[in-house]
C-alpha cells in the first residue's frame, strides 16, 4: 500500500521536475535555477512586470550571439521565437533562418545583420515588423554559455541522426561531447544540402535533447553549478517572478510537448551573397497557426 505521504512526495517531485523542464527551456539552460533561489535579490535588466498577450500564452525571442558584451557589431547566429501555451501544455520553437531577406531601417538585408546595426532592440523591432506581431521579451545567449554550461554538466550525450552524421562526416548514434564539441555541432552548416536550414533542424533537436539530459535525476544536483557557469553570458529583459509564476502552470510539460517549426522559403544569390526569401504563405501560416494571439491590430 502506498501511503498518502509517498503520493504527495511523488507528485511534488513531478511538479518540481516539470517546472525545471519549462524554465530550462525558457532560457535554454539557466532559468531553472530560479527554483533554487539564485535570482533572489538580483537585478534583472529592464524587468517587465506585465506579460503581454493572453494569460495562458507567453512569447519571447531567443537570440544566440558570439558575445553578449557588445550591443552592436555582432550578428545573431540563431533566432528563434519561443511560444509557451499553458492551456495545451505545449512549447513551440519557431526558427527564423538567419539569412532571411528583410527590411532593416528601410534597406533590405539579412535578418541576422540587425543585431550588428542596433543590438537586440533593433532585432526585436525587425522581427515585430517582419511578422506583424507584438513582441517585447527577449533572451540573448552567448555561445560561450553553451560551452560553460555543458562542461559544468560534465559533458552531454548527443544522439546524432543518420542525416546529420553524414553531413558532418561522423558516425551516427550517441556521442559524448564537451561544451566546445557541442557548440561546433550546433553551429555546423557546410555539409548540409541547405546549410542554414540543416543547422536549424540540428539546433532544435539539440534543445530537446539538452532538456531531457539536464532534467535526469542524476543531473539535477548539478544545476546550480551549471547556472553559475552560464550566468555571465546570458542577458534578458524578462521578469523572473513572472516566469516562475507562468512555469507553475506547466505541471505536465516535458520534451514530448516541444514542437519545432520554421519559416519556409528558398535561397537566392545577389551580388555574390546568399539570402533566403521567406514565402508570404509561410509567414501567414506561422501567424495564424502559432502567433494568432500576438498579431498586431
Identify what each model region corresponds to.
Residues 3-4, 9-297:
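Non-catalytic, solvent-exposed segments at the cell envelope interface
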Amino acid at each position: 500500500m502506498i501511503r498518502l505521504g509517498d503520493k504527495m512526495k511523488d507528485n511534488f517531485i513531478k511538479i518540481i521536475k516539470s517546472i525545471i523542464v519549462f524554465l530550462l527551456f525558457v532560457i535554454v539552460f539557466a532559468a531553472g535555477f530560479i527554483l533554487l533561489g539564485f535570482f533572489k535579490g538580483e537585478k534583472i535588466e529592464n524587468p517587465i512586470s506585465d506579460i503581454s498577450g493572453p494569460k495562458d500564452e507567453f512569447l519571447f525571442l531567443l537570440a544566440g550571439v558570439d558575445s553578449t558584451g557588445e550591443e552592436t557589431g555582432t550578428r545573431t547566429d540563431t533566432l528563434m521565437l519561443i511560444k509557451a501555451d499553458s492551456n495545451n501544455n505545449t512549447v513551440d520553437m519557431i526558427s527564423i533562418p538567419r539569412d532571411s531577406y528583410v527590411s532593416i531601417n528601410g534597406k533590405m538585408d539579412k535578418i541576422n545583420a540587425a543585431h550588428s546595426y542596433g543590438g537586440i532592440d533593433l532585432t526585436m523591432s525587425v522581427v515585430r515588423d517582419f511578422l506583424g506581431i507584438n513582441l517585447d521579451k527577449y533572451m540573448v545567449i552567448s555561445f560561450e554559455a553553451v560551452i560553460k554550461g555543458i562542461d559544468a554538466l560534465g559533458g552531454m550525450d548527443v544522439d546524432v541522426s543518420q542525416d546529420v552524421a553524414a553531413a558532418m562526416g561522423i558516425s551516427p548514434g550517441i556521442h559524448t561531447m564537451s561544451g566546445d564539441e557541442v557548440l561546433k555541432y550546433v553551429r555546423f552548416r557546410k555539409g548540409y544540402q541547405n546549410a542554414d536550414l540543416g543547422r536549424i533542424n540540428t539546433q532544435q533537436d539539440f534543445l530537446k535533447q539538452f532538456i531531457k539530459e539536464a532534467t535526469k535525476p542524476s543531473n539535477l544536483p548539478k544545476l546550480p553549478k551549471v547556472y553559475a557557469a552560464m550566468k555571465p553570458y546570458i542577458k534578458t529583459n524578462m521578469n523572473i517572478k513572472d516566469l516562475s509564476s507562468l512555469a507553475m502552470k506547466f505541471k505536465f510539460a516535458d520534451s514530448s510537448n516541444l514542437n519545432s517549426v520554421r519559416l519556409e522559403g528558398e535561397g537566392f544569390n545577389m551580388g555574390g551573397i546568399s539570402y533566403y526569401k521567406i514565402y508570404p504563405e509561410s509567414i501567414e501560416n506561422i501567424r495564424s497557426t502559432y502567433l494568432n494571439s500576438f498579431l498586431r491590430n
